Amino acid sequence: MIYITPIAQKHFTKLLAGKKPGTQIRVFVVNPGTVHAKCNVCFCPPEEFKTSDVVIEFDLFSVHVDSVYVSFLKDAKIDVMINELDSQLTIKAPNATKECNNTRNNMNNDLLEDRVRNVLQFQINPQLELHGGSVSLIRITEDLLAVIKFYGGCNGCAMASYTIKEGIETTLKNLFPELKGVLDMTQHQHGTHSFY
């Protein structure tokens, strides 16, 4: 389903060496089945493995793909171009823009908790990953509050409360008007792991 070139596999293996043990790679599509479809890659720690994941095994790591994205990632190719200054990841997914009505309808009909979890994983976490952090949904309360927990560089970060109100809560409430707000259950401990 997804082909990763040998040089890209080496690149991922090197990046994963500095991550929490058991962390793998996740490949996903933002706006699948539209002309705005964009494929992305992020780290996937063990606590974010999902039962709906399709797991593709490579020699030194595995790639997790939520089953709703499988048809969009058929025949995808991941490569990396390395020059003297930097490296550039390239993802070619010829089916990412193709409409798959059943899949898109299933995505829209997911439980609120699943839809919120997908937004955190596929929209919020790629941004937080730039700071070495991530956020997970713990649960949605009966009062329709999303209970979240920060990990990595976001734990203890002085900007965490701003990130919650201006970033996460605003995004989630715009997408899911039924949500009343976001609660952070992280035991924030500022340390060398904290981004700011």
Swiss-Prot record:
It comes from the Bacteria. Homodimer. SUPFAM superfamilies: Fe-S cluster assembly (FSCA) domain-like (SSF117916), HesB-like domain (SSF89360). GO terms for biological process: iron-sulfur cluster assembly; protein maturation. HAMAP family: Fe_S_biogen_NfuA. Involved in iron-sulfur cluster biogenesis. Binds a 4Fe-4S cluster, can transfer this cluster to apoproteins, and thereby intervenes in the maturation of Fe/S proteins. Could also act as a scaffold/chaperone for damaged Fe/S proteins. This is Fe/S biogenesis protein NfuA. Gene3D superfamilies: Fe-S cluster assembly (FSCA), HesB-like domain. Belongs to the NfuA family. The keyword Iron-sulfur applies. The keyword NAD does not apply. [4Fe-4S] cluster binds at C154, C157. Keywords: 4Fe-4S, Iron, Iron-sulfur, Metal-binding.
